[in-house]
Amino acid sequence: MTLLINLSFLLSKPTGITTYALNLLPHLKKLYPTLLVSQDIPGYNCYPVPSNQTAEQGVKGHFNRLVWTQFQLPQIYRKLKSQILFSSLPEAPLCSNCRFVITCFDMIPLRFPKRFSPLTPYHRYYTPQVLKQAQHIICISETTAQDITKFYGIPANKITAIPLAYDRTHFHLLNLPTRNYFLYIGRQEPYKNIQGLIAAFAALPNYKDYELWLVGPSDRRYTPTLTAQVAELGITNQVKFLDYVPYDELPKIINEAIALVFPSLWEGFGLPVLEAMACGTPVITSNLSSLPEVAGDAAILIDPYNTKEITEAMQAIATNSALRSRLSSQGITHCQQFSWEKTGKATVEVLSRYI
């Protein structure tokens, strides 16, 4: 029996979904012969993905991949006589006899429909059919599990929440001196609330003594708005847009930050929170969605819609060394409960029900 794993949607640059999939593979390979439908990944048998359907091809690539998933993927499934298809994204063949387990990261497109309006048919018609036909659904947080039931009516007994983890060999305390910059890591979509973060930073009484580093790929839809806001507030010299930072450079940037500020309006998980805690960096994050699940009592939780609260939290960390020390210590302890070994073991337990 071969476990067929659909990774046809992976991007060459690491994202949350890519990180999740690549960290699960070693745990699955230990127990099952595996074949990956993906770009070449060293150490694994891979069925190549046609070049015209990769995520780098944009909307056309996504469309080609969905068509390929419906017609070509079932043929691979039958040829291998697989008992189950596992996909770390809610994409699977619908009109076939494929049995599949999928992972769902979040319901953000349904919570912020205006942002994702071009993809409305995908999220309103295709995704719910995949979820309904799946043998089982894995979610990365209790928040996402509840959202799936809320938006799609999927019964709770068909869903298992298995949290993400972080790379312990990569993200850890480096004992570097703290520099005077606040850090954000993530994309620039409006639900990430970067505009609120910029406004909160500008309201710091002594903002000129600090910098705000925004790490994440630039986006022609949103970057101009953010840079215009920075200019209007007169803080151009204090705000740095660092675009995409190589994975190997992230630990140093996180370790040296005075704090990670992650004020999202909604998240399926919020991996940067764990990575910052592992580095001993204090965390300010939202009191909404999955973020309290991830942060526990080891972070300052703020109302992301309240700019004043964000400013006050940043000011408190900037001026109170005892608070920084306490949050650093609590974060290092708290993040130890998350590991890819636990995530992998729990995932194997779900898959084993259908193999």
Where are these regions (language model features)?
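Carbohydrate transferase catalytic cores enriched for Leloir-type hexosyltransferases
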Residues: 1-355
